[in-house]
Amino acid sequence: RQSLAVLAEARRQHQPGRCLLLGAHLEGPFLAPQKRGAHPSEHLCAPSLAELERRISGFEDDIALVTLAPELPGAEEVIAALRQRGVVVSLGHSAADERTARLAYQQGVGMITHCFNAMAGLHHRAPGPVGALLGSPPVALGVIADGIHIAPAMAALLQRLFPEQVVLVSDALAPYGLPPGTYPWDERSIAVADGTCRLEDGTVAGTTLTLPDGVV
């Protein structure tokens, strides 16, 4: 809520000719624990309308996008509540299979936060959320095109299959613009090398990528 308050104030102080802040992306807290990536487990919780209100009350107009795991019990009503408010709901940090993902798209989930990262891959016997895109309503496909999060060939495949739906995502973290090294990151430290941010255990946490760097 502290971050939302800062964003809301920045939006109120918008100056003509300056970058327009369209709204916050809440990547959590309704994430699958086994797919949490770099998100601390103590920050996660089960989806419910009460938990949603506790986090966004007073800032409803400042939130543009929410990432959640649609397979979690309670997610369906949270998705409906967010869509009613005009918030884009994105599948991410999720263990959803093809069937669950397809149902989520039909319920109004309109994006995949970062394709192939912290979610099931595209397997010939288990197509997962990406396979569920075929025959579903159009969904925006977030792609972290740093060559680490997703292989360049797979990024090119997505672009070929869904040319109007791919959205570049920088996934840039606080060390953006800083040289390689180790930096404090919340209560942890994060190592930056070759444009990639990793936790001490080697978990890929994000990038220091600019969006133009992802264009070839």
Set out the residue ranges of the language-model regions:
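Active-site-adjacent C-terminal substructures of enzyme catalytic domains
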Residues: V78, T100-V216
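Histidine/acidic-residue-rich, glycine-tolerant segments that coordinate divalent metal ions
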Residues: S3-P127, P175-G177
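Conserved strand-turn element in the central/C-terminal portion of the radical SAM core barrel
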Residues: R1, L68, I144-D146
